[in-house]
């Protein structure tokens, strides 16, 4: 801060001793120390205030940048939503134009019959009396074939 050498400090101490006197010198030195301490605290407070203001300015710039990006994102999202809405409206209009409200329902030209019930199946084993009167089914390739 100050560029005083040792010899310059000795000269200042001797002049102060002569001017103030040996009786009041300790009290003056204590007061000077308190004043110097206050000065150092004041300087450090000013430095911290300046640093805080600089950080505040940086934060404001960052906030503005984030807000700008948010506005850009919002506008692009609104544009995309408008495109999608237009596509949906176009599709709805196409569907509405293809379907007419006045169209009568088309009557059925033939009746659908219910399928016939399946024939009951025998649960009896192969070798019992229920199947004794029937012939076994022909296995392809095992007997004479008619051409």
Swiss-Prot record:
GO terms for cellular component: TAT protein transport complex. GO terms for biological process: protein transport by the Tat complex. GO terms for molecular function: protein transmembrane transporter activity. The chain crosses the membrane at residues 1-21. It is a single-pass membrane protein. InterPro entries: TatA/B/E (IPR003369), TatB (IPR018448). The keyword Membrane applies. Keywords: Cell inner membrane, Cell membrane, Membrane, Protein transport, Translocation, Transmembrane, Transmembrane helix, Transport. Pfam families: TatA_B_E. Residues 117-147 are annotated as: Disordered. It comes from the Bacteria. The keyword Transmembrane helix applies. It is found in: Cell inner membrane. Part of the twin-arginine translocation (Tat) system that transports large folded proteins containing a characteristic twin-arginine motif in their signal peptide across membranes. Together with TatC, TatB is part of a receptor directly interacting with Tat signal peptides. TatB may form an oligomeric binding site that transiently accommodates folded Tat precursor proteins before their translocation. PANTHER family: SEC-INDEPENDENT PROTEIN TRANSLOCASE PROTEIN TATA, CHLOROPLASTIC. NCBIfam families: tatB. Belongs to the TatB family. HAMAP family: TatB (MF_00237). The Tat system comprises two distinct complexes: a TatABC complex, containing multiple copies of TatA, TatB and TatC subunits, and a separate TatA complex, containing only TatA subunits. Substrates initially bind to the TatABC complex, which probably triggers association of the separate TatA complex to form the active translocon. This is Sec-independent protein translocase protein TatB. The gene is tatB.
